[in-house]
Structures are given as C-alpha cells and as structure tokens.
C-alpha cells in the first residue's frame, strides 16, 4: 500500500467508526467524547501497525449531514509512534468551537 517513508493524509469520519449506539439522527456524531475515542483508536492502530502519526487537524468542511471530520497525516515507519505535538482533545475542542456554530 505504501513504501517505507511514504506519507499520506487520511480522512477520519467518526460517523463510520463509532458504534451505532453513539451515532445520532441522520448519522451525525455530535459528542466530543465519541470523536476523541474514535481518533484515539485510529491513531493507536496506525502507530502499532508501522505508521508514525505526524499531525492531526479537523477538516474545515463538514460532511453533508453536518458531521465534523478529521485529517491525520501519517508516514510509513516500522517503528511507529505519534508526534508529541498531536493533541487529540485540543483538535476536537477547536473543531467543535469553530464548526458547531
């Protein structure tokens, strides 16, 4: 899929990663805690499977139904890991502060 040192930006769509019980009307996830949980799981999976997580940001564009989505920047690196500057809570808080208006 990606050679060592290769980089990619992946879109995290919480509405598809959260359990059904955590998804609201029209498939929208509004709970910040659910967003944090989904992102933590994805970042943990990536870092344990040969990817280094370089950055995390929220998408400035909401999904068609109003979902907040996130972008994670990763590099193929057998040692894995997460950059110390990646702050899931801060990114989720900023996303909700900016996009939940």
Where are these regions (language model features)?
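Rossmann-fold NAD(P) dinucleotide-binding segment
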Residues: 1-3
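Conserved beta-strand signature within the Rossmann-like core of class I S-adenosyl-L-methionine
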Residues: 5-12
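Conserved nucleotide-binding/hydrolysis micro-motifs of P-loop NTPases
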Residues: 14-18, 61-62, 77-79
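Short, glycine-/aromatic-enriched active-site segment of Class I SAM-dependent methyltransferases
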Residues: 14-31
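Short alpha-helix
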Residues: 35-49
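Conserved S-adenosyl-L-methionine
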Residues: 50-60
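Conserved catalytic loop of SAM-dependent methyltransferase domains
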Residues: 58-69
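Flexible, glycine-/basic-rich loop-and-beta segments that form/coincide
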Residues: 68-101
